[in-house]
A protein has these predicted regions:
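Short, basic/aromatic-enriched C-terminal tail that caps enzymatic domains
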Residues: 28, 273-274, 281-305
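Nucleotidyltransferase catalytic core that binds NTPs
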Residues: 3, 8-259, 266-267, 290, ...
Length: 305
């Protein structure tokens, strides 16, 4: 990962200065410095909005930034941190896409004022042992396939909340289980931040925007569209009841043999059991080669006529 040439400096009191300043964008790597900056902004009457990311930014992240920037009287912080604690030992941490300079350029284009880009040993210094337990939901769906993933995710999000102290934080709805767990953590731990879910940004053919789409070759990219098509089929089947929703989605997925489907599940919006009538969420996970893809959509389940 290429970093800007202006490295972190310190004043005579040992306080960390910004590591990078250009065109109105300031990049901080030190948590204490960023905390002081956001505290001063709140003291001056501004609100702080946060967009947590792992970098490799795309148009889905761009929409998160725009939503954050739309809050009147606010200053937006975008975090760029590939969090090792949410990757399993056989997962793609080492090859996860990293494009630091391009990420900064997108932040500048969207008028973001602050970027937080810490090093791993800053976030997890020697002796760090604390983690957030996601509870039973953390072992279901994505958690069943990726043990420890949600504990690592919640831990870093909790740290980002403590460092940035945002008034509002924005997360994409594509990672619906992540969003549900973050909302539950905020509720259970009385964290004073408003969590906003932003609808999934899609390609023109329906594929959900994702940093991991970069792993797909041209053939896989075409095959991946079956996931969003399956979600659409499930939505149309909502008026026939919950079982029909799942069956319709599975039928579409079965038409694409390259997809190794992990799960197709209909749940309540907070990921409890699926309702027989009302709002629900259809969630799909599948692999194309070595790439794991997830997506979800709202479904309105109604009574059979």
């Amino acid at each position: 990962m290429t970093r800007p040439s202006s490295l972190r400096t310190h004043d005579l009191l040992g306080r960390s200065r910004p590591k990078y300043v250009k065109d109105g964008l300031t990049v901080h790597a030190d948590p204490n410095t960023l905390r002081r900056v956001t505290k001063a902004m709140r003291g001056g009457g501004r609100r702080v909005t946060l967009v947590p990311t792992m970098g490799a930014l795309h148009d889905g992240h761009r929409e998160l930034m725009r939503r954050a920037r739309s809050i009147p009287g606010s200053t937006t912080v975008v975090s760029l941190f590939v969090n090792p604690r949410q990757f399993g030992p056989t997962e793609d941490f080492d090859r996860y896409p990293r494009a630091f300079e391009a990420d900064l350029e997108m932040c500048r284009e969207e008028g973001v004022e602050l970027v937080f880009a810490p090093e791993v040993d800053t976030m997890y210094p020697e002796g760090f042992t604390t983690s957030i337990d996601p509870g039973p939901l953390g072992g279901e769906l994505e958690g069943a396939a990726r043990p420890g993933h949600f504990a690592g995710m919640l831990t870093v999000v909790n740290k980002l909340f403590a460092i940035c102290v945002p008034d509002v934080a924005f997360f994409g709805e594509k990672d619906w289980q992540q969003l549900a767990l973050i909302r539950r953590m905020v509720r259970d731990l009385d964290i004073d931040v408003h969590v906003v879910g932003v609808p999934t940004v899609r390609e023109t053919d329906g594929l959900a925007r994702s940093s991991r789409n970069a792993y797909l070759d041209a053939t896989q990219r075409r095959q991946a569209v079956a996931i969003s098509a399956a979600l659409s089929a499930g939505q149309y089947a909502g008026e026939q009841g919950p079982e029909a929703v799942v069956a319709a989605a599975r039928e579409v997925l079965a038409s694409e043999p390259a997809l190794d489907v992990d799960y197709v599940e209909l749940r309540s919006p907070d990921l409890g059991p699926a309702p027989t009538i009302g709002d629900a969420r259809l969630l799909i996970a599948a692999r194309l080669g070595t790439t794991r893809l997830i997506d979800n959509a709202h479904v309105s389940v109604t009574e059979r006529v």
